Amino acid sequence: MAQSVPPGDIQTQPGTKIVFNAPYDDKHTYHIKVINSSARRIGYGIKTTNMKRLGVDPPCGVLDPKEAVLLAVSCDAFAFGQEDTNNDRITVEWTNTPDGAARQFRREWFQGDGMVRRKNLPIEYNP
């Protein structure tokens, strides 16, 4: 059963943070790449700390071993300096898919007793 094996590693490009640059009076979109560097199929889901300001497309999916996906991270217009942006980040969560599961993302993979790994990517806003 896949759930008894801890999920392997993923890589993200960029690897440590996402940077948006001013002006913030229009929507910005930044692309990040998520790569499944493990030997098992994984399901991934992306969470944001500020759903009003930040969006991710596609927000979830399935990656085969060594497969990559390009995600569009969007930042809606906002009043820079007047809103708290200190804790903004996106979190990539991933888990092994069950053996024999279809290549269709299922939220319940994250709700059972299988191990879920997380990688945080802080958002930096340059004035």
Curated annotation (Swiss-Prot):
GO cellular-component term (any): cytoplasm
Function: Central component in molecular interactions underlying sperm crawling. Forms an extensive filament system that extends from sperm villipoda, along the leading edge of the pseudopod.
Organism in which the protein naturally occurs: Caenorhabditis elegans
MSP domain location: 9-126
Tissue expression as described in the entry: Sperm.
Protein name as annotated: Major sperm protein 3
Pfam family, one: Motile_Sperm
Cellular compartments annotated: Cell projection, Pseudopodium; Cytoplasm, Cytoskeleton
Lineage: Eukaryota, Metazoa, Ecdysozoa, Nematoda, Chromadorea
InterPro entries, per the entry: Ig-like_fold, MSP_dom, Nematode_MSP, PapD-like_sf
Gene: msp-3
Keywords, sorted A to Z: Acetylation, Cell projection, Cytoplasm, Cytoskeleton
Modification type N-acetylalanine: residues: A2
Miscellaneous field: Around 30 MSP isoforms may exist in C.elegans.
